[in-house]
Amino acid sequence: MKLIPIILNAKNLSGMAGSISICCWIVVFVPQIYENFRRQSAEGLSLLFIVLWLLGDIFNVMGAMMQNLLPTMIILAAYYTLADLILLIQCMWYDKEKKSILQEVKKNVDPVHLPPANPINETVLQDVFNEYEPLLPRIEEEDSQSYSSLELGRTIVVKERENFFNDFLIVSGVLIAGILSWYISYCSGLDNGIPKKKPAFEQINLPAQILGYLSAILYLGSRIPQIVLNFKRKSCEGVSFLFFLFACLGNTSFIISVLSASWLIGSAGTLLMDFTVFIQFFLYAKPKYEKILIDN
């Protein structure tokens, strides 16, 4: 394969954006699936959000097949549906485990009976009189706890910086992979910006277009339950930041590369919804070390 210089025109920029979009959508579900597995919980995710997204992907697959799109596009749509199913299974499985644990706890816990109050005797009065003596080790213990909390807080700050750096590397790697994959096809002559003979006009498949619009509506509406859940909890804990970041990047690059009304509505609309979730991430974000200091 011979390396050739890139001609920066609208077609090549569109192809590059499309390649980046595909790479983002390939990995978009991985961070959230991993987050659920790591926490052994999907409590932060709205079940309705996953269900609506799944229905949108199902209509997307059906529309792509009816419109006779490229096999790669159909395979990608099927892959998204499979990833949705994995998230849905995680939500249902971890919720079932949580309920079973709560039921087990209720069975094993006996009613609490308060013991009768101990009478104040001479020993108690003596302890009160000499209170300054037992307070000394208690003060030292509190100082020790405060110091350990500060140390833990510093450790968490370092860990958060490491996570940010790791996220930056992951996002950069996906973007570079998208550009490189496009450049390989560009050098191979598959996408070199040279005008090709236009294919004959393809008749629009009305049922496929209807499915495309339905898919767009479902994509657009799927974010609303998640936004509402985050608002009620005043937290985005349990939701992967990279999940929505890759969704934003995928939709943004897709909008740049495609000019099809039904799919643009879905991408542009969900992009606005994803930005709303981003605002919630920063609005509800509280440094973990502050929580620890407050608790202690």
UniProtKB/Swiss-Prot annotation:
Induction: Up-regulated during histidine starvation. Up-regulated by addition of ammonia or amino acids to a nitrogen-depleted medium. Down-regulated by excess lysine.
Positions of transmembrane segments: 13-33, 45-65, 69-89, 164-184, 200-220, 239-259, 263-283
UniProt-listed Gene3D superfamilies: 1.20.1280.290
Source superkingdom: Eukaryota
A GO cellular component annotation in the UniProt record: membrane
Compartments it resides in: Vacuole membrane; Mitochondrion membrane
Domain PQ-loop: 10-76, 208-270
GO molecular function, one term: basic amino acid transmembrane transporter activity
Topology in membrane: Multi-pass membrane protein
Keyword Ribosomal protein: no
Disruption outcome: Decreases histidine import into the vacuole. Resistant to fluconazole and caspofungin. Suppresses CDC13-1 temperature sensitivity.
Keyword entries, A-Z: Amino-acid transport, Membrane, Mitochondrion, Repeat, Transmembrane, Transmembrane helix, Transport, Vacuole
Residue intervals on the Cytoplasmic side: 34-44, 90-163, 221-238, 284-296
Vacuolar compartment residues: 1-12, 66-68, 185-199, 260-262
Gene Ontology biological process terms, A to Z: basic amino acid transmembrane export from vacuole; L-histidine transmembrane import into vacuole
Similarity comment text for this entry: Belongs to the laat-1 family.
Main function: Amino acid transporter that moves histidine into the vacuole. May also contribute to low affinity arginine import into the vacuole. May function as an amino acid/proton antiporter.
Name of the protein: Vacuolar histidine transporter YPQ3
Organism of this sequence: Saccharomyces cerevisiae (strain ATCC 204508 / S288c)
